Amino acid sequence: MPRKKPFSVKQKKKQLQDKRERKRGLQDGLRSSSNSRSGSRERREEQTDTSDGESVTHHIRRLNQQPSQGLGPRGYDPNRYRLHFERDSREEVERRKRAAREQVLQPVSAEVLELDIREVYQPGSVLDFPRRPPWSYEMSKEQLMSQEERSFQEYLGKIHGAYTSEKLSYFEHNLETWRQLWRVLEMSDIVLLITDIRHPVVNFPPALYEYVTGELGLALVLVLNKVDLAPPALVVAWKHYFHQCYPQLHIVLFTSFPRDTRTPQEPGGVLKKNRRRGKGWTRALGPEQLLRACEAITVGKVDLSSWREKIARDVAGASWGNVSGEEEEEEDGPAVLVEQLTDSAMEPTGPSRERYKDGVVTIGCIGFPNVGKSSLINGLVGRKVVSVSRTPGHTRYFQTYFLTPSVKLCDCPGLIFPSLLPRQLQVLAGIYPIAQIQEPYTSVGYLASRIPVQALLHLRHPEAEDPSAEHPWCAWDICEAWAEKRGYKTAKAARNDVYRAANSLLRLAVDGRLSLCFYPPGYSEQRGTWESHPETAELVLSQGRVGPAGDEEEEEEEELSSSCEEEGEEDRDADEEGEGDEDTPTSDPGSCLTARNPYALLGEDEC
């Protein structure tokens, strides 16, 4: 055994300093993470297992990973359907932080908000989704799974070989979640693709449309959800855009909380927060449109009269509740059969499955995380039967719901398809869990360059001595100003907690309280045409007919700055489940509003 060498106090001190530097990743001398809790968050992430032994990408980040010592008593793995994204390198994260500190924000023109689906997904390229490889009944389960894993790795290899990580968006790297999509498509007679009306192009992969309508020969219904969050003219413009690009689509406008047309609205105004008491699922706008679309698709092959009768009962019950001033209990109404399929039920079926078997139409619900799939199912049922959350990836396993004896709904976990979208836009779309973001500042800058965040929140520049003087803003300045206004401080040094402030701003955007809507190509030039379009007036009237009566709802309004106090506590933890908060906009002095409660839906925690 070699003789021990003396180790001085000075050497020990130097050793500890070097160890801290390595853990914090501060070899370049940048200590930006010391101003917030992001440093400790990133250090914890470095200690987790982030590699996938067989994956083409060497760094996979498993979001919302739960500690588990093995399978549960029923063989359930809590991490089976977790979101798997490619991890950003530390160099890339630090580069974005420097840009957030140095890059001066400039407002963009309205044309920049126009999104063309051909630029986002590039139809015909390798930006496809994984298909289930050919199989036969002679194959064992192990052989089938091994073949699927090899095919999936080849799929990832093609994408990462054609595009660099900087160009690619976040997309799902978890094969188990894609298997859920395969099963839903195999079971379904009709496929619903749910999108968020604020950015429907983000949630509409053309490869899925071609596969469903072409290879499978199924009808695809595009649901433009949350239409209460966008101006009616923009909703109509998006509807016509998709009809023109994809003529085989059946398009349905949907929202679980229609707005009242008696109050005007201006997108991007200062918002207030409402607290709804009771439930409002029976006031959903869109179930009847979806019924008509399914009737046109089935052409009498399935008896949907029970569904029509249910919609009539829901409308009558909502009207009766408004007159009496009472709300129904969640347990009232006919029972809804809920099934959670096991692995044996998830095994593939034959390619020639019988359509409308036993007189039942199976409707598969597919969409990105946070587009409102679970809220849509609750709106169709008429009460809460599905747990909802604003955390992406909340729906973790395959479930079926019998809406009526002849109508079955299949809920698929949210899937992120590969695209060329900016990752900052994906964060603002609610695709990436905000509590898990390593670097939120560039997303705040992306938002602030498209809507006047500083003016809406009445922020004062951190370096401004004279409030009336003009100062250039960067993303870091906005976060620091919001932290100062909200009182977000670090634990020991009491510095402004910019990381927490950035998370808070992103939550306001995802919840719809800072409204950012994107436009179809050419909308800026034709805005007046769409505002005077007959369908725009019809949409306003339809929302007014089913919208809530203001005299029957008890609301507690709070100013934006004070209502964020509760959110400050939520920022410390991961997003919570539950329902109850709704947001109502109010404008700055002199601005004009067009709708009451246009941000109501995002008060419900979305999945």
From Swiss-Prot:
Lineage of the species this protein comes from: Eukaryota, Metazoa, Chordata, Craniata, Vertebrata
Record-level Gene Ontology MF annotations: GTP binding; GTPase activity
Similarity annotation: Belongs to the TRAFAC class YlqF/YawG GTPase family.
Modified residues (Phosphothreonine): 48, 50
Function: Possible regulatory or functional link with the histocompatibility cluster.
Compositionally biased tracts (Basic residues): 1-14
Biased composition (Basic and acidic residues): 15-26
InterPro entries in UniProt: G_CP_dom, GNL1-like, GTP-bd, P-loop_NTPase
Disordered: region residues: 1-81, 544-607
Pfam families per the UniProt record, alphabetical: MMR_HSR1
CP-type G domain boundaries: 178-418
Phosphoserine modification, residue list: 32-34, 51, 68, 324, 561-563
Name of the featured protein: Guanine nucleotide-binding protein-like 1
Domain notes: In contrast to other GTP-binding proteins, this family is characterized by a circular permutation of the GTPase motifs described by a G4-G1-G3 pattern.
Acidic residues: compositionally biased ranges: 550-585
Organism: Mus musculus
Binding-site residues for GTP, renumbered to this chain: 225-228, 367-374, 411-415
PROSITE patterns: G_CP
